[in-house]
């Protein structure tokens, strides 16, 4: 993988810098690197593809090195150089694709395609290494079973989960109390509701709690917490728990009280915030517990009192909500996030070439299903194919 990254980095720089009219002395360093690549790979043969609808391609290399000149690069020099560079770029792209579409239950961090295994040969170690990529650094660490670390922006760590629970219900759902939530990616949106507006709750206070486990530990997270849940602040028709009927959710918004957010690691509270909104920081955690209250207003104008009657029927739901977003964090495991398109690249290629479902990844690279069973095998394979996707993204931009 190191060699593949160094190849891609060298070829990307060469394509950008070797242009007509450039003074040779300004590009002599990258020309020498390209010549090092040519001398290392000339005489080699590779084969890529042969899985799903990915066609088999045979690669041979017999190129002359790029020359030197005391003058500016002319059109002929650039054209000859581009022919060589484009062939190597096409080869690197094919190796990346071949690697992305393969998986293995055992040692999934190691190269799975014959072409990438071949590039691990000592013969190619002469190629200039450039390991500045976060993915390459972490791939090397994971390959040696050492601790890795990824900086993530809006990490997709929460599997999709959209549901509700009722702590009080009637067959007609005309007097209900409970919570409704949507967890997905890096965001939790939770609302507590009560048809009676805490009329019969102790002290006219209704308690709510929402616990969200995660499949991996996050470190040094920046989190935002806001006292509203916009997705649950509008009327909605909601299926009953048995799916045989529907009921009308008709929220009237109140501000939540006594809000508490706890970040836990292995069941122990690491960071705790009370009645604090805006930007929060959490050191390390693998689950989040959110608790809050709905308090019946002690004083109401006639218009408000009409919304929350003292007896049935109860046409509305007093509702309090919260939105928690994980803005950034570090994680030892590879995840998709808002900054990088690698999940899309991987999924698109596997669909394009009709790659059969293998022993590791779910059909269609379903991210929710993948997270719900984020095994060590999946993590190894995901780190490898995301690394290949990061290399491919350099040369196809």
UniProtKB/Swiss-Prot annotation:
Chief location of this protein?
virion
Q: At the top level of its lineage, which domain of life is listed?
A: Viruses
Q: How is it modified after translation?
A: The N-terminus is blocked.
Its BP terms in the Gene Ontology are: fusion of virus membrane with host plasma membrane
| Residue sites binding Ca(2+) per the record | 266, 286
Q: Which GO terms describe its cellular component?
A: viral envelope; viral intermediate capsid
Where is region (Interaction with the inner capsid protein VP2) located?
A: 62-73
Q: Which UniProt keywords apply?
A: Calcium, Capsid protein, Intermediate capsid protein, Metal-binding, Ubl conjugation, Virion, Zinc
Which InterPro entries does the record match to this protein?
Capsid_hemagglutn, Rotavirus_A/C_VP6, Virus_capsid_a-hlx_vir
Give the residues the record marks as binding Zn(2+).
153
Gene Ontology terms for molecular function: host cell surface receptor binding; metal ion binding; structural molecule activity
Q: What other note does the entry give for this protein?
A: The VP6 trimer contains a zinc ion located at the center of the molecule. The zinc ion is not essential for either trimerization or transcription activity of the DLP. Zinc-depleted VP6 has an increased sensitivity to proteases.
Supply the HAMAP family for this chain.
Rota_VP6, Rota_VP6_A
Describe the family membership recorded for this protein in Swiss-Prot or TrEMBL. Answer: Belongs to the rotavirus VP6 family.
Question: What is the designated name of this protein?
Answer: Intermediate capsid protein VP6
């Amino acid at each position: 993988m190191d060699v593949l990254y160094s190849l891609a980095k060298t070829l990307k720089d060469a394509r950008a810098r070797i242009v007509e009219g450039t003074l040779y002395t300004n590009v002599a360093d990258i020309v020498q690197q390209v010549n090092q690549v040519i001398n290392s790979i000339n005489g080699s043969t590779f084969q890529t593809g042969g899985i799903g609808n990915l066609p088999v391609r045979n690669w041979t290399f017999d190129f002359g090195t790029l020359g030197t000149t005391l003058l500016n690069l002319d059109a002929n020099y650039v054209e000859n150089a581009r022919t060589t560079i484009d062939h190597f770029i096409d080869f690197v792209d094919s190796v990346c694709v071949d690697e992305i579409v393969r998986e293995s239950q055992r040692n999934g961090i190691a190269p799975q395609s014959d072409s990438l295994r071949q590039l691990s040969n000592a013969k190619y170690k002469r190629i200039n290494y450039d390991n500045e990529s976060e993915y390459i650094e972490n791939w090397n660490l994971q390959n040696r079973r050492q601790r890795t670390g990824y900086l993530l922006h809006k990490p997709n760590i929460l599997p999709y989960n959209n549901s509700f629970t009722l702590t009080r219900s009637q067959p007609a759902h005309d007097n209900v109390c409970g919570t409704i939530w949507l967890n997905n990616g890096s965001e939790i949106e939770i609302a507590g509701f009560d048809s009676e507006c805490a009329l019969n709750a102790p002290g006219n206070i209704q308690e709510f709690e929402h616990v969200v486990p995660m499949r991996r530990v996050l470190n040094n997270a920046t989190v935002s917490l806001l006292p509203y849940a916009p997705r649950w602040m509008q009327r909605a028709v909601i299926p009953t728990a048995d799916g045989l009927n529907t009921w009308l959710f008709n929220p009237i918004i109140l501000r939540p009280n006594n809000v508490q957010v706890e970040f836990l690691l292995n069941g122990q509270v690491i960071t705790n915030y009370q009645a604090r909104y805006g930007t929060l920081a959490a050191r390390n955690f693998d689950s989040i517990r959110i608790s809050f209250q709905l308090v019946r207003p002690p004083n109401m104008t006639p218009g408000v009192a009409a919304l929350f009657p003292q007896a049935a029927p109860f046409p509305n739901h007093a509702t309090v909500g919260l939105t928690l977003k994980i803005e950034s964090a570090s994680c030892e495991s590879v995840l998709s996030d808002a900054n990088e398109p690698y999940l899309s690249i991987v999924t698109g290629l596997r669909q394009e070439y009709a790659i059969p479902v293998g022993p590791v990844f779910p059909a269609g690279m379903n991210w929710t299903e993948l997270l719900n069973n984020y095994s060590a095998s999946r993590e190894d394979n995901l780190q490898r194919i995301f690394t290949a996707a990061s290399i491919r993204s350099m040369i196809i931009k």
